[in-house]
């Protein structure tokens, strides 16, 4: 099972996450802010509370906002693949 093993906030919109298979990198989460559920993450103090839930291994914040670890893994994998193929995803 692929699980996150380390996470930290990098900026108000980005986190660094590392998975147990070695995949790691920064993920900009600003795309989540369009959904009202994630609006609190715009607050830098809340954003900085990011951690890995010990029971579910999901990515969580102090105010009970959760992001699926598998979604983030696949998102990061896609970002790495696009980078390797020299594809600018911002132009799609």
Task: Label the model's feature ranges.
Residues 1-92:
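Motif-centric detector for short Cys/His coordination patterns
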């Amino acid at each position: 099972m692929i699980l996150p093993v380390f996470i930290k906030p990098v900026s108000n919109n980005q986190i660094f996450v590392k998975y147990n298979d070695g995949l790691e990198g920064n993920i900009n989460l600003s795309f989540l802010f369009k959904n009202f559920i994630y609006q609190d993450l715009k607050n830098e103090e809340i954003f900085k509370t990011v951690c890995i839930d010990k029971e579910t291994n999901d990515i969580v914040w102090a105010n009970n906002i959760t992001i699926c670890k598998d979604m983030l893994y696949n998102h990061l994998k896609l970002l790495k693949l696009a980078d390797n193929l020299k594809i600018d995803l911002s132009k799609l």
